[in-house]
Amino acid sequence: MEKDSKVIEKEGNKGFTKSIISTVKNIKLGYGMDIYQMSTPASLIAPYSSLTYISDSFSKNFEILIKANSIENDLDRLLEIFKYITTIFIINNNACGKPIVPIVGETQRFKFSNKDEDGNEFNDSFHCAEHVQNSPFPLSVSSTVNEKEGIELCYNYAAKILFMATYFRINIDEAETFIKFNKFNETYNIILPTLYTRIFRGFSEYSGKLKIEPTKSNYYIDANFQSKPLIGGKYNYFEAYVSKKDTDEKIYKIFGQWDKEQQILDFENYQTDFFFKRPQQFYEKQLPNEILPTDSSVVWKGLIDAHNCGNNKLKLKEKTKVDEDQKLIENQRKKENINFKPKFFIKNKETDKWELDKFNKY
C-alpha cells in the first residue's frame, strides 16, 4: 500500500530535524553563526546551486513584468509589479535542503520564453547569473532582461545563512533588488522578506517586510509577510498597503496567501474584490549552443547525478572534489597575484553595484 503524501512529508521532516540536531552537536553551532559556507551533511544538500534558485525565481513568471510595461498608469503598473513579486517565492518540496554554495565564477545563462494562462507568448527574455566573489563575503549577482521591452531586473545577493537555535535565517532581505523600465525612465527598488527554515517544524517560510518603492512616481507598497503560528493561522499569508509618498495616505490593502488567492480592499469605498491568484507557470529555457564549463549544470553534474541515484556517500565525495579543486585554483591565483574577473558582470563605479556587461552577455 502506498503511503499518504502527508505521512511521507512528516517522515521527511523527522529525518531533516534529526540530521540538523546531529550537525549542531558535531560541529558545535553557536547562536547567530553564519553556516552558508560551512560543510553540510550530504542528506541536507539540495541537488541544485543557489544560482538555480535565483534563476528560476525571477524568470518563471516574467511575463507579468512584460505586461506591466504596457500599463501607462503609475498606480496600476505598481500593482502589476507587486503581482510579479508574489510569484518569485519558490514552492519547494525540499525547502529544508540547503542549496549548493556556488564556486567563484560559476554561471548560469539562458534565453527563455513565458506564456500566460490565455496562451499568449512572451519571448526574447534573457537571464544571466554569476557568483562573483567569496571574499570578503560570498556574492552572487543576476540580471533578467528583455531588451525589446526595455526591462531589466537586477539582483545582488551577499549570502548568509544564520543559525538561530530553532531556525535558520536566510538574509534575502539584505539583497539589493531593483527593476528598471526604460519606457517610463523608472526604477523600482525592492526589499524582500526574510526566508526562514523552521528546524523542528520541518518547513520554510518567508516572513518580515517587503517594500516596493519607485524612484519617480508617488506610490509605494509596504507588506508584512506573517509567520505561521504553531496553532492555527495560514501558511504564506501577507498583508500589504499601497500608499502615497507625499501624504502616506493608504489607498489599498492587499491580503491573502502568496501561493493562493489574494484580495484587494479599496479604502475609498471599502469594497473588497479579487486581486490575483498565482498563475500556472509556462516557462521554457533555451540554453546557449555552447554550455560553458562554469555553468552550474556542469560544475555540479556529479553531485546531482549522485543525488538522483540516492547515493549520499558519492554525493558528498563529488561535493568535496569540487571544493578542493576550487581551493587549488584560489591558491594559484593568490600565488600569481591574480584577481578574479567575472565573465558576464562589471562593477558600476558610480553606484558600486554589479551590472550585466551588455557587450559580453552571450
Swiss-Prot record:
Entry superkingdom: Eukaryota
Name of the protein in question: Oxysterol-binding protein 5
Organism of this sequence: Dictyostelium discoideum
Family indicated by similarity: Belongs to the OSBP family.
Any single Gene Ontology cellular-component annotation: cytosol
PANTHER family on file: OXYSTEROL-BINDING PROTEIN 1-RELATED (PTHR10972:SF78), OXYSTEROL-BINDING PROTEIN-RELATED (PTHR10972)
One Gene Ontology term of the molecular function aspect: sterol binding
Pfam families in alphabetical order: Oxysterol_BP
